[in-house]
A protein has these predicted regions:
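NAD(P)+-binding Rossmann beta1-loop-alpha1 motif at the extreme N-terminus of oxidoreductases
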Residues: 2-66, 70-73, 79, 101-105, ...
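Interdomain hinge/lid region at the active-site interface
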Residues: 191, 216, 221-224, 228, ...
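Glycine/threonine-rich flexible loop motifs
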Residues: 82-97
Length: 493
């Protein structure tokens, strides 16, 4: 034993909001000795450490500190310090406070929802100073932090053997006992993967909401009936955390005895990671339409006043048609399942493109398995996704894997019917229809993009390729007879 580490703790944690508290308790419950620190801001954050140590952490191997130097000194070398603070400048400020007290080889772990580009920069900065930095995406919310989350670490690879025992011990375990925490890759890859996870989460939630909305407005099902349908779906291929909680929500009553879901205002908030996933997909030149739709629908939902005004100007006239409820529920199932597969396929395609662009060498099968427990998008078909990516002949696209190709063929008829009927009844299903249009575009050998490129060449001399020439040769047409032969350089519209 290193005598310098005698009576030292195994890990330090900074930031005692609920996520930080729960992670510290989780670590202590797994046998680790933990030092905790929280800033003191007069009139804003006072007595945070004392309340935690004497409250929820009482009797556990958790030591509290209000002095950052004493906190750092209390941790065994090489120090492992997990930061659970608000993403952005707060992380940078905290790092600057820590640097003077660290020793060479110490490890900082950012467990917040940081932008992966910030993590890229922080890894480089820490390593330049002789330290190590891990950007670890943590999914699972308050419950996951306490009982086991999905943790996605990336950054300084030499830090992994040091932090692996602790992080894997507090991570959720999949049904086969595998920890939902594996090394992702270098730089900001861990936070990038968490960002795409959150984007898929946005898509999942929008799709489930649309399924609920069609049941309610097209079929006229009551809350109990809808809850039963979601509960039944959770016993099959749609089994997942989000379907599970959706089965509970319609039946939940408030203190007055009424159904709470019917009293919740139809405006959905967002914190930004869904938007980040869409922006980064665009920068990588990858379609992420379903998730973009989910993000934009939250934005539109927030414009409640505008929607109320518009609803009085354009009255939706729904027919009095009586639908075969059992058959229509099957169609809703098909639309939900198929669209979810599209959402995951789009997300994993972005991960693959990022892996290639940034030389991260991401293991998509490992990522799929990592999401099987603890995280918000955990679902049974992630096993099938992992299997597809582990195949000897790895598919170019998830939906082209034999298993998913067969699933999509079985689901397509009901999916099409559901979207068509919803449009006929003037019932918005933007994510279902976005997914269906993406699928049709994906399986189309030809698209109308030739017209777009002709237009670009007409007004901007952006050139085009020809179907009767080899790929890679570019041509410009003098469309008007007086435009000249000069081609566009780097100018793009």
């Amino acid at each position: 034993m290193n005598m310098k580490n005698l009576n030292k703790t195994d890990i330090g944690l900074i930031g005692l909001a609920v996520m930080g508290e729960n992670l510290a308790l989780n670590m202590a419950d797994k046998g680790w000795n933990v030092s905790v620190y929280n800033r003191t801001v007069p009139g804003v954050e006072e007595g945070v450490v004392e309340r935690f140590v004497n409250g929820r952490a009482k009797g556990k191997k958790i030591e509290g500190y209000t002095d950052i130097a004493e906190f750092v000194t209390s941790i065994a070398i090489p120090r492992k310090i997990m930061m659970m603070v608000r993403a952005g400048s707060a992380v940078d400020e905290l790092m600057e406070q820590l640097f003077p007290h660290l020793s060479e080889g110490d490890i900082l772990i950012d467990g917040g929802n940081s932008n992966y580009e910030d993590t890229n920069r922080r890894v480089a900065l820490a390593e330049k100073k002789g330290f190590r930095f891990v950007g670890a995406g943590v999914s699972g919310g308050e419950e996951g932090a306490l009982n086991g989350a999905s943790i996605m670490p990336g950054g300084s690879e030499s830090a992994w053997p040091e932090v692996k025992p602790i992080l894997q011990s507090i991570a959720a375990k999949a049904s086969d006992g595998t920890p939902c925490c594996q090394w992702i890759g270098p730089a900001g890859s861990g936070h990038f993967v968490k960002m795409i996870h959150n984007g898929i989460e946005y898509g999942d939630m929008q799709l489930i909401a649309e399924a609920y909305w069609v049941m309610k407005n097209l079929l006229g099902l009551d809350n109990g009936q809808m809850a039963e349908i979601f509960a039944d779906w959770n016993e099959g291929k749609l089994r997942s955390y989000l379907i599970e909680i959706t089965a509970n929500i319609p039946r939940h009553k408030d203190k007055s005895g009424g159904y709470l879901i019917d009293k919740i205002l139809d405006t959905a908030g967002q914190k930004g990671t869904g938007k980040w996933s869409v922006i980064n997909a665009m920068e990588l030149g990858m379609p992420l339409g379903l998730i973009a739709t989910a993000v934009f629908e939250r934005s539109l939902s927030a414009q409640k006043g505008l929607r109320e005004t518009a609803s009085k100007q354009f009255v939706c006239r729904r027919s009095q048609a009586v639908y075969n409820k059992s058959e229509m529920v099957k169609d809703i199932y098909s639309a939900l399942y198929a669209s979810k597969l599209v959402s995951y396929a789009q997300g994993f395609a972005v991960l693959q493109r990022a892996s290639d662009a940034f030389a991260w060498n991401l293991d998509l099968a490992s990522i799929a398995r990592m999401w099987r427990g603890g995280c918000i998008i955990r679902s049974i078909f992630l096993n099938d996704i992992a299997t597809a990516f582990e195949a000897k002949d790895k598919p170019k696209h998830l939906l082209l894997a034999p298993y998913f190709k067969n699933e999509m063929q079985l689901l397509l008829s009901g999916w099409k019917h559901l979207v068509a009927q919803s449009m006929k009844e003037e019932l918005p299903v933007p994510a279902f229809s976005s997914a269906l249009n993406y699928f049709y575009s994906l399986v189309s050998a030809k698209l109308p993009a030739n017209m777009i490129q002709a237009q670009r060449d007409y007004f901007g001399a952006h050139t085009f390729e020809r179907t009767d020439e080899l790929r890679g040769q570019f041509f410009h047409e003098n469309w008007t007879g007086h435009g000249g032969d000069t081609k566009s350089g780097t100018y793009n519209v």
